[in-house]
Design a protein with these regions (language model features):
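Domain-level signature for proteins that mediate thiol-based redox and metal-cofactor handling
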Residues: 1-99
């Protein structure tokens, strides 16, 4: 059975194409809920007008659906709390010049 950690690890493969870094390191992944074969991914984007939003959501859907045992993936886009660079990992801040 898939675990939350499995999903988070897989989501390192979803990249924000504008920033060239994955959504986990960017702090865009807010939560992952796993209930048997069902996975719910709660995430944000760097801005409300992010042109890469639909592509990021498609990638989340694809990556999570490819995990063994996952039958249903729900994706929730949230703006609460609003994303800020403070949510990025230390490595991401350094690489992108925020550190």
């Amino acid at each position: 059975m898939v675990t939350r950690d499995d999903v988070v690890e897989a989501l390192h493969g979803v990249e924000d194409p504008e920033l060239g870094m994955d959504i986990v390191e960017l702090g865009l992944l807010y939560d992952v809920e796993v209930d048997g074969p069902k996975v719910k991914v709660i995430h944000s984007l760097t801005s409300m007008g992010c042109p890469a939003g639909p592509m990021i959501q498609e990638d989340i859907q694809r990556v999570a659906s490819e995990l063994p045992g996952v039958e249903d993936v729900q994706i929730e886009l949230t703006w609460d709390p609003p994303w800020t660079p403070d949510l990025m990992s230390d490595d991401a801040k350094f690489i992108l010049g925020f550190g």
